Amino acid sequence: DADMRRPRIARYLNIDKQDGLSEYLAGLCDNAEITKNTDLGFDVIVSGNVSSSSAELLATPRVDALFDECSREYDYIIIDTPPINVVTDATVLADKIDGYLLAVRAGFSSVDDIKQTVHSLEQVDAKILGIMLENVDPKTEIYGKYSRYGKYGKYGRYYKNYCNSYSRYKY
């Protein structure tokens, strides 16, 4: 959880947030102390204590050391960051990670917000792996090109697979 301003992962997983990423980056503990096992089949590093200097912490050489160590241990590393358009924390990591998977909340994120996010990532030569639409209500009316279908209903399967088959996002 690299969202050290408004961390949520520890709360969602009911894990103690002490001794997390912020403490590691500040040099107060090592990787073994911050890596926590879950009953869900994955390990997690929580944010630690809330920090107003998280962008500076994420720019330290200790981030590289942590990512190197984790990449030897794990097949996949998923990093939760604050919103890209709000603070610079996420873009500080651009040259340290393979790419970004943007989480877009249905009914909350505007097309302009998404465009600005993509633009911000392009400015730092970041690779965008895809866009994930979350909090979708399958009973919501469909508007635009497919409005004649009405509610998702029997077309639900189509929409569930839409993002998987659509290789290029257009806006």
Q: Where in this protein do the model-derived segments appear?
A:
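P-loop NTP-binding module
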Residues: 1-171
